[in-house]
A protein has these predicted regions:
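Conserved beta-sheet core of the metallophosphoesterase superfamily
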Residues: 161-254
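Hydrophobic/aromatic residues located in beta-strands of well-ordered beta-sheets
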Residues: 52, 106-108, 213
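A short acidic (Asp/Glu
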Residues: 32-34, 62-66, 117-122, 171-173, ...
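Active-site metal-binding loops of divalent metal-dependent hydrolases
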Residues: 24-28, 56-60, 112-114, 163-165, ...
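Short, solvent-exposed aromatic-acidic interface loops
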Residues: 220, 254-267
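N-terminal active-site segment of His-dependent metallophosphoesterases
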Residues: 1-93
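Core dinuclear metal-dependent hydrolase active-site scaffold
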Residues: 1-16, 20, 151-179
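Active-site neighborhood of divalent metal-dependent phosphoester bond hydrolases
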Residues: 64-149
Length: 268
């Protein structure tokens, strides 16, 4: 018997890492196709990760957008809040449908678009808690746990958040956001928000010391650009991300495009 082969197999069987499927910003809304949520659920069923993490901005909540005032022409065309909530619940149900009987812990790190619910309620004290209750109950009833916008959720030493904030309480951004985050962060971090798939590994002084920052892109329909970004530079990345984590670091990363998800699951 090959002892080296036996030892190798023993190491594989005793692997204590975690496989995490990360879903980037999905920006669900009543007018955007929802079949992608079913595809994502089917992919979860296929690969059976240890965790599923949605990086936030599950829904756009354009009904609460403060960029279009209610007394403007565009503002008058906005959907009601409950229309957005019912749309989100349909999307959540499609993920569960695709997963079938596979049971995987699911967590969402709320994004700035979910934060719109908080900001709207703050202006109307009489309805405090009512809209947030609709938001949180939608996730809890579909078996998702939730962390607040700006907080960091950890899996095996790796942090997950919609977008990290700097010392001034502002979101990291710009052309070199990942580099800036790596300079300031003490652990590997996974985030979204910019809709761009980027991966930066920064070496640190010391034996085997480094920080890896992964931006997961977005999970919108392929080549869809949100209305607010029509005239902006985009270069968005459309897909979901598989991560393998051990030794408190992201060791492997695989980006699965929305095109591939559609080819594999779209006609099943």
């Amino acid at each position: 018997m090959d002892n080296n082969k036996s030892n190798h197999n023993s190491k594989i069987n005793s692997f204590k890492g975690h496989k995490v499927l990360v879903i980037g910003d999905t920006h669900d809304s009543p007018n955007i196709p929802k079949d992608r949520f079913l595809w994502i659920g089917k992919h979860i069923k296929k690969i059976k990760p240890d965790y599923v993490v949605h990086i936030g901005d599950f829904s756009s909540f354009d009904s609460l957008s403060y960029f279009q005032a209610n007394d403007t022409q565009q503002g008058k065309l906005k959907d009601a809040f409950m229309v957005d909530i019912l749309s989100m619940r349909t999307a959540l149900a499609l993920i569960n449908k695709g997963m079938g009987n596979v049971q995987v812990p699911k967590h969402i790190t709320l994004g700035n678009h979910e934060q719109r619910v908080h900001k709207f309620e703050e202006k109307i004290p009489e309805i405090e808690g009512m809209m947030k209750d609709q938001l949180y109950q939608s996730f809890h009833s579909s078996n998702w746990t939730v962390s607040e916008y700006g907080s960091i959720f950890f899996v095996s030493g790796v942090g997950f958040t919609h977008v990290p904030k700097n010392i001034m309480g502002k979101e990291y951004g710009g052309r070199n956001a990942e580099i800036s985050i790596a300079n300031d962060c003490l652990h590997d971090l996974v985030f979204g928000h910019t809709h761009k798939d980027r991966d930066w590994k920064a070496p640190k002084i010391g034996d085997k010391q480094f920080v890896r920052i992964v931006n997961v892109g977005c999970a919108l329909p392929m080549n869809h650009v949100e209305r607010y970004a029509k005239l902006n530079m985009t270069g968005w990345s459309y897909g979901i991300v598989e991560l393998s984590i051990w030794d408190n670091h992201i060791q492997e990363k695989n980006f699965v495009s929305m095109d591939r998800l559609e080819r594999e699951y779209g006609k099943n």
